[in-house]
């Protein structure tokens, strides 16, 4: 027996048995290929192409609208009355409306001082503003720190209230709802909301309140987010590109056309009477902000987006935190659509076109189709056509439409144009979780109401770096393994290899790149990695 002849140690009966199984499996696949696999894949291609066209038309429509808005200079002060609030000698400070500032927080050790300090630094008559810190922290040390910070500002004459609850029912929505029940809130006209990592500039109220004061049908003024850590890592740059498009295009288009868009949950100021008329805060989904916005819109209230007003905040820089955030942002809207679709269709307070905009454009295309088609088409169906060459995808669906959509997205962040290829691959990876979360929301699955507060690092990374010489850093490798990403990566790698040897479409160039992106995410090598000491 030769040393390299491994087949000689395997019984002939086993080899024959293995060949029989392989032949039988091949025969079964051949038998079901034509009547089952090919038609099913063709149907999948047709559905995905339809969704791609829906998304393409929506993006082109928004591109046209935003171009017209810029061309004709439809600035906010041309659509809504704006006059600076003037001093009144007779009325004194009572001429200024009473404003409530709400800051909900949960174990925000790294950023609580930033948000509280920024809120206390807002320029407004001191007797016409109330700052309400809603602390749901479960860590007693952090609660003490937050309370001490509030006391420190109170000693300086700031009207600040520190509020806690004995439970976390309703999470953020529950905290905001409880805050609105306080007796001192009854005298307030407007409420501005800032999450714990948001830092408004001192003139925030001077630039927003006049719109609400002079336009009685205006319920909400939303500011834009400005990211202080967008250059921290490649993942934060990718987030910046997506969110810049959201604010620059989606929010602006909604504000300019139907005076409706989704409230971003922070960096906005509401008319309290409108908030109450809409039914107040509800915790039935994880997107209480969007829920409130839709209900207020159905009451006939209008919204205004101020793109020129920016509020600094922090992007999630760890992959774990970003995944949790994207689950909430994808699952919540799908679940809200399930709960409110009929209510929207039967509403009599808004026009038919606004109903179409809310149901079709806002929910179906942007919150459902955009997530599903990205993953199902580009990461499942398109690769599958490599293995089943009887099914083809037209070039306009595989190349032209996604290329145009990508270029339209680039208008939000011109400085990151050179990163578009990385952005595409990253968005496809994240579409896996968004698609899963979307179906959980639509079907009200087990994690439909999962609420995990997005982790903010603040300067924790810098602090960790200074301790490297004193302590040995250990990374728990197993905590960073993500099986779903690795599974999709293996599928794409296999299809890519098959296409490289037997295919004719040269999809393997894309498939290999996308597989690598899934592997990078699957092994947790993305975003900021916080060491465990």
Curated annotation (Swiss-Prot):
One of its GO terms (biological process) is cell wall organization. Its EC number is 2.4.1.32. Possesses glucomannan synthase and mannan synthase activities in vitro. Mannan synthase consists of a 4-beta-mannosyltransferase activity on mannan using GDP-mannose. The beta-1,4-mannan product is the backbone for galactomannan synthesis by galactomannan galactosyltransferase. Galactomannan is a noncellulosic polysaccharides of plant cell wall. Required for lateral root development. The chain crosses the membrane at residues 37-57, 368-388, 404-426, 483-503, 510-530. It is found in: Golgi apparatus membrane. It catalyses: GDP-mannose + (glucomannan)n = GDP + (glucomannan)n+1. The gene is CSLA9. Expressed in cotyledons at the base of the hypocotyls, in root elongation zone, lateral root primordia, vascular system of young leaves, abscission zone of the pedicle,. Pfam families: Glyco_trans_2_3. This is Glucomannan 4-beta-mannosyltransferase 9. SUPFAM superfamilies: Nucleotide-diphospho-sugar transferases.
């Amino acid at each position: 027996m030769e040393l390299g002849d491994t087949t000689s140690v395997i019984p002939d009966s086993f080899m024959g048995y293995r060949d029989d199984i392989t032949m039988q499996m091949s025969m079964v696949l051949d038998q079901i290929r034509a009547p089952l696999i090919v038609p099913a894949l063709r149907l999948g291609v047709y559905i995905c192409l339809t969704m791609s066209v829906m998304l393409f038309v929506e993006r082109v429509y928004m591109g046209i609208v935003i171009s017209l808005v810029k061309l004709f200079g439809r600035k906010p002060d041309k659509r809504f009355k704006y006059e600076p609030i003037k001093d009144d000698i007779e009325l004194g400070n009572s001429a200024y409306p009473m404003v409530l500032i709400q800051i909900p927080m949960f174990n925000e050790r790294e950023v609580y001082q930033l948000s509280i300090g920024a809120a206390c630094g807002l320029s407004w008559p001191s007797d016409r503003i109330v700052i309400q810190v809603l602390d749901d922290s479960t860590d007693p040390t952090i609660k003490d720190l937050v309370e001490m910070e509030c006391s420190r500002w109170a000693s300086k004459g700031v009207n600040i209230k520190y509020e806690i609850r004995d439970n976390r029912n309703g999470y953020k929505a529950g905290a905001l709802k409880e805050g609105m029940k306080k007796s001192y809130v009854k005298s307030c006209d407007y409420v501005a909301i800032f999450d714990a990592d948001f830092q408004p500039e001192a003139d925030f109220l001077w630039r927003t309140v006049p719109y609400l004061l002079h336009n009685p049908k205006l319920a909400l003024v939303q500011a834009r987010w400005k990211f202080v850590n967008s250059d921290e890592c490649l993942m934060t740059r990718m987030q910046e590109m997506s969110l810049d498009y959201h604010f620059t295009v989606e929010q602006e288009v909604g504000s300019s056309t139907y005076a409706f868009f989704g409230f971003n949950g922070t960096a906005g100021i509401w008319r309290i009477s409108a908030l109450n008329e809409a039914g107040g805060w509800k915790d039935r989904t994880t997107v209480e902000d969007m829920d409130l916005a839709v209900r207020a819109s159905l009451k006939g209230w209008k919204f205004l987006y101020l793109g020129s007003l920016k509020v600094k905040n922090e992007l999630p820089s760890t992959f774990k935190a970003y995944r949790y955030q994207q689950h909430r942002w994808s699952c919540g809207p799908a679940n809200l659509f399930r709960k409110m679709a009929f209510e929207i269709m039967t509403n009599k307070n808004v026009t038919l076109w606004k109903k179409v905009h809310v149901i079709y454009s806002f929910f179906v295309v942007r919150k459902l189709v955009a997530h599903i088609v990205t993953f199902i088409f580009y990461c499942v169906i398109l690769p599958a056509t490599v293995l089943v060459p009887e099914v083809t995808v037209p070039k306009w669906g595989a190349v032209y439409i996604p290329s145009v959509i990508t270029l339209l997205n680039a208008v939000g962040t011109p400085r990151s144009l050179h990163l578009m290829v990385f952005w595409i691959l990253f968005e496809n990876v994240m579409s896996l979780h968004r698609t899963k979360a979307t179906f959980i929301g639509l079907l009200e699955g087990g994690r439909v109401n999962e609420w995990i507060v997005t982790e903010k690092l603040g300067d924790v990374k810098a602090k960790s770096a200074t301790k490297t010489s004193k302590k040995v850093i250990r990374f728990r490798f197993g905590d960073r393994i993500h099986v779903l990403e690795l599974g999709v990566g293996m599928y794409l790698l296999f299809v890519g290899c098959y296409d490289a040897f037997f295919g004719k479409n040269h999809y393997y160039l894309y498939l290999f790149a996308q597989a690598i992106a899934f592997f990078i995410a699957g092994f947790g090598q993305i975003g900021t990695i916080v060491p465990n000491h």
